[in-house]
Amino acid sequence: MALRLVEELTNEGIIKTERVKKAMLAVPREEFVMPEYRMMAYEDRPLPLFFDATISAPHMVAMMCELVEPRPGMKILEVGTGSGYQAAVCAEAIERKGKVYTIEIVKELAIYAAQNIERLGYWGIVEVYHGDGKKGLERHAPFDAIIVTAAARTIPSELIKQLKDGGVLVIPIEEGVGQVLYKITKRGEKIEKRAITYVLFVPLRDS
């Protein structure tokens, strides 16, 4: 089932690189969904977790992962851990060589994600934190890439500060009645914004 889904995403041009393709095949999505949704794990759709959180649709996980151009040795920050699935995919995409830090504002979700990450052997490559992701994770900055899995009203300035020069922020931003996914590249004191597509994410929560 995973292979069929990944082949579909590859044929649709969402998965572009062999690295992301291998990562999507390596991570068992059924281990990151609630038990009652395991049979739906390889449908290309978001699925409910708890506390109004969701696990993103596979196409969105793959797209965001491709946008940060993963490579071995990268240091990635994820804002909005959810169940830990995106963090695990990122860990595989950097070939488990580097570090993925992920921060979740809902304590119960952070605990759930940490349990998933540890059970599946990603602990040490992935570190899970409980806190306000809009503030980033300054103690581990700067980052090569930051992925935000919830929609912000504006680009959080702290996240830009915590990017390396040339680093990439992938984030959905609320615009009018919708949301737009942006790839933002830091160039010295300036940023380059590129709109990718319209999306639908849960809102980025305040602490």
From Swiss-Prot:
Pfam families: PCMT
Main EC class the enzyme belongs to: transferase
Keyword Cytoplasm tagged: yes
Gene Ontology CC annotations of this record: cytoplasm
UniProt keywords, alphabetically: Cytoplasm, Methyltransferase, S-adenosyl-L-methionine, Transferase
Domain of life: Archaea
Localisation per UniProt entry: Cytoplasm
UniProt-listed Gene3D superfamilies: Vaccinia Virus protein VP39
SUPFAM superfamilies (alphabetical): S-adenosyl-L-methionine-dependent methyltransferases (SSF53335)
An MF annotation (GO) of this entry: protein-L-isoaspartate (D-aspartate) O-methyltransferase activity
A GO BP annotation: methylation
Primary location recorded for the protein, binned into one broad class: cytoplasm
HAMAP family with a match to the protein in the record: PIMT
NCBIfam families xrefs: pimt, PRK00312.1
Functional description taken from the UniProt entry: Catalyzes the methyl esterification of L-isoaspartyl residues in peptides and proteins that result from spontaneous decomposition of normal L-aspartyl and L-asparaginyl residues. It plays a role in the repair and/or degradation of damaged proteins.
UniProt record similarity statement: Belongs to the methyltransferase superfamily. L-isoaspartyl/D-aspartyl protein methyltransferase family.
Identification of the protein by name: Protein-L-isoaspartate O-methyltransferase
